[in-house]
């Protein structure tokens, strides 16, 4: 009984501390304008430049909902907090301590969920598109032929793993054991397809880490589309994949055993060089948005983790559109997680 007053005092003290931190963070936010940061520091902190970030906010804000409370965070801060998290990958601690954002970790988490879903729902359908018309296919083929001398390629395909925390054991729709990949960690196996300029043409983050690259492609709408196009007479368009995929009329992969100096060896060499963009795409994507990099575990349920992956992939294409280059030393190098030769991580 004697401990009750102490306990009550502790609760009051904790409430007072929370109120103080809430007021402090608001005062800190009000006193600083992130858009007054030097451009180099802004890009380092938020991974996009200031002009592109403003454009992103303009695209999303009309769909962000009404601010019902004066204490509610301005939408631009929610976007900045999301960009900072995507770029750092250190969960919410570094974001919460960023004085330019000055938000609590729960607020960061809510903002991340909100903004990633907005980007996925509104922008991803416009910015990540697989070629379907002859004009689109011809343009992509021209890029591959000009760079690598390989005819007919309309994309490079591979899988890349993004680590996540163990899903709840009670989640019957996402049983933890199916997310354990070949490296023994829980992950999502993401199917990526890109063009010769590292633009992402397709991104599928629905499958757990135990699912093979080829199995994901086999049930994809893209494979079904390629098969139907082939059956309707388009026999000059194909994807480029590694040995983790099966050879198909619309998917070229390496020939397993070839004689030195043979045409088959030359084909394998040309195929390998033509696959370079998918490795580079993965490196740029994870280098810019380091929450996806190997060993930076996403502490989210698989569904929310997928939204983060989709948002980062969409922003990757938007950054390419804006010619926002990434320093070579920032490009991630991962080569030990895939299912085939020269696998992307």
Q: PLM features: what roles do these ranges have?
A:
Residues 1-67:
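Charged, often Cys/His-bearing segments associated with DNA-binding zinc-finger transcription factors
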Residues 42-46, 71, 271, 275:
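Short acidic-aromatic active-site loops that bind/stabilize oxyanions
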Residues 49, 81, 95:
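Short alpha-helical segments in extracytoplasmic peptidoglycan/chitin-binding modules
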Residues 55-56, 81, 140:
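A structural signal for short hydrophobic/aromatic patches embedded in well-ordered alpha helices
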Residues 57-71, 89-91, 289-294:
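Structural recognition of short helix-loop-helix hairpins that underlie histone-fold modules
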Residues 75-88:
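Short, amphipathic alpha-helical "recognition" segments used to contact nucleic acids or chromatin
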Residues 90-94, 98-345:
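Short, well-ordered secondary-structure "scaffold" segments embedded in the functional core
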């Amino acid at each position: 009984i004697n401990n009750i007053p102490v306990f009550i005092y502790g609760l009051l003290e904790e409430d007072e501390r929370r109120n103080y931190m809430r007021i402090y963070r608001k005062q800190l936010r009000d006193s600083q304008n992130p858009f007054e940061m030097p451009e180099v520091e802004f890009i380092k902190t938020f991974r996009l430049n200031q002009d592109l970030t403003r454009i992103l906010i303009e695209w999303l804000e009309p769909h962000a909902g009404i601010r019902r409370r004066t204490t509610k965070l301005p939408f631009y801060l929610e976007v900045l907090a999301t960009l900072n998290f995507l770029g750092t990958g250190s969960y919410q601690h570094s974001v919460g301590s960023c004085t330019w954002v000055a938000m609590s970790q729960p607020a960061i988490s809510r903002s991340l969920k909100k903004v990633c879903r907005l980007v996925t729902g509104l922008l991803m359908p416009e910015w990540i598109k697989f070629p379907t018309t002859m004009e689109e296919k011809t343009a992509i083929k021209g890029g591959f032929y000009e760079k690598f001398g390989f005819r007919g390629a309309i994309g490079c395909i591979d899988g890349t793993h993004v680590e996540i925390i163990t899903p709840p054991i009670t989640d019957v729709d996402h049983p933890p054991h199916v997310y354990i990949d070949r490296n023994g960690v829980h992950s999502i196996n993401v199917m990526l397809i890109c063009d010769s300029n590292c633009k992402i043409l397709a991104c599928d983050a629905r499958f757990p880490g135990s699912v093979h690259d080829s199995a994901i492609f086999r049930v994809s709408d893209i494979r079904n589309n390629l098969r139907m196009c082939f059956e309707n007479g388009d026999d000059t368009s194909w994807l480029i994949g590694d040995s983790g995929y099966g050879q198909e009329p619309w998917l070229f992969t390496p020939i397993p055993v070839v004689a030195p100096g043979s045409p088959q060896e030359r084909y394998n060499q040309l195929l390998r060089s033509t696959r370079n963009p998918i490795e580079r795409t993965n490196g740029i994507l994870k280098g810019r948005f380091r929450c996806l990099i190997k060993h930076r575990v996403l502490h989210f349920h698989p569904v929310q983790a997928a939204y983060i992956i989709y948002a980062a992939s969409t922003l990757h294409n938007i950054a390419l559109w804006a010619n926002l280059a990434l320093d070579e030393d920032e490009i991630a190098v991962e080569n030990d997680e895939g299912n085939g030769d020269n696998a992307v991580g």
